[in-house]
Amino acid sequence: MTLIHFSFCSAFILGLTGLALNRSPILSILLCLEGMLLMSMDGIVLTPLHLTIYLSSMMLYIMLPFAAPEAATGLSLNSDHYTTHGTDKLFSLNLLEC
């Protein structure tokens, strides 16, 4: 495992740990998910360069359309939830009201 692969894997594990430990603020959850998605996409880009497998680079084009709408939708829902409820904590989110 090269140093670049190790740094991407450790950043993904760090995002997963942050997701497990900071479950209360919605913005923290979104940032951890976004970091994990970014590291997995970087790993998908980097793997075909070292293994000379060009077919797996197509997976990036499959994952990329989900990244930007996920971030935009999450931030807009978070700002709307903060303006209506006054907090961004996850426990104040009631799914039965939706």
UniProtKB/Swiss-Prot annotation:
Pfam families cross-referenced by the UniProt entry:
Oxidored_q2 (PF00420)
Tell me yes or no: is Translocase among this UniProt entry's keywords.
Answer: yes
Q: Which UniProt keywords apply?
A: Electron transport, Membrane, Mitochondrion, Mitochondrion inner membrane, NAD, Respiratory chain, Translocase, Transmembrane, Transmembrane helix, Transport, Ubiquinone
Which GO cellular component term is one of those annotated?
mitochondrial inner membrane
Indicate yes or no for the key word Membrane. Answer: yes
Q: Which Enzyme Commission number(s) are listed? A: 7.1.1.2
Which EC class, in a word? Answer: translocase
Catalytic activities: a ubiquinone + NADH + 5 H(+)(in) = a ubiquinol + NAD(+) + 4 H(+)(out)
Cysteines engaged in disulfide bonds, as pairs: none
Which InterPro entries does the UniProt record give? NUOK/Mnh_C1-like
Q: How does the record say this protein sits in the membrane?
A: Multi-pass membrane protein
Show the GO MF annotations: NADH dehydrogenase (ubiquinone) activity
- State the compartments where it is located: Mitochondrion inner membrane
Residues annotated as transmembrane: 1-21, 48-68
How is this protein organized at the quaternary level? Core subunit of respiratory chain NADH dehydrogenase (Complex I) which is composed of 45 different subunits.
The entry's family comment says: Belongs to the complex I subunit 4L family.
Q: What does this protein do?
A: Core subunit of the mitochondrial membrane respiratory chain NADH dehydrogenase (Complex I) which catalyzes electron transfer from NADH through the respiratory chain, using ubiquinone as an electron acceptor. Part of the enzyme membrane arm which is embedded in the lipid bilayer and involved in proton translocation.
* The name this protein goes by in its record: NADH-ubiquinone oxidoreductase chain 4L
Q: Which organism is it from?
A: Xenopus laevis (African clawed frog)
